[in-house]
Amino acid sequence: HALVLDSLTPRGEKEICTQRIGTRRVTQTERRRDALGAFQWLAAQPGVDASRIALLGWSHGGSAVLGATNLNHPDVARAVVRPRLAVAFYPGCEADVRRGYRASTETLLMLGLADDWTPAAPCQTLAGEGPPRVTVLAWEGAYHGFDDTGPVRHRADVPNGVNPGQGVHRGGHPEARQASQQALVDALQRALTR
């Protein structure tokens, strides 16, 4: 089974990439609560094994993965249903580095080392600060969206990133795309078949 969670459309948003951090109407708190609610809903569905749920997210959704698995959030700590695996592609990790991160489950972070939108360094710091359940895979020369098939392009319309107001780069990196896809399949097989 697969459930695709849309935190934006029901709140009247089509995208948040061009919105400055701090002005977004859809927050990480809402996205975390959406994910926690989705776990509860999934657990109540016939044919769903609530002990075999994986949570995946990309970019802002990747940050939501971290929020939904951070035991430092009281609602996560209280959650009855938790995913067995969490995978975040190029998440923003700065907020979790500041507040502290305690993983509720096995967590895989996949990062581009050239990412100037959501840089890899804070995620590497987060993983290095002791969460024993966090694994990082990172690729040299890979930008945000490295698992895409399109070329790297500059997005001047994105106000956030390493150099605020100067835009960011986004696009595919064939080696990182292939390796991350295989890493995802391997992680899902390990987590969900035991």
Q: PLM features: residue spans?
A:
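Short alpha-helix in the alpha/beta-hydrolase fold that links the catalytic acid
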Residues: 118-128
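Primarily recognizes the serine-hydrolase "nucleophile elbow" in alpha/beta-hydrolase
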Residues: 26-103, 116
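Acidic catalytic loop of the alpha/beta-hydrolase fold
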Residues: 114-118, 144-145
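Serine-hydrolase catalytic machinery in alpha/beta-hydrolase-like enzymes
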Residues: 1-47, 148-170
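C-terminal catalytic histidine-bearing segment of alpha/beta-hydrolase fold enzymes
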Residues: 133-194
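Alpha/beta-hydrolase active-site loop signature
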Residues: 9-12, 93, 143
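Short beta-strand/loop motif that positions the catalytic acidic residue
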Residues: 109-111
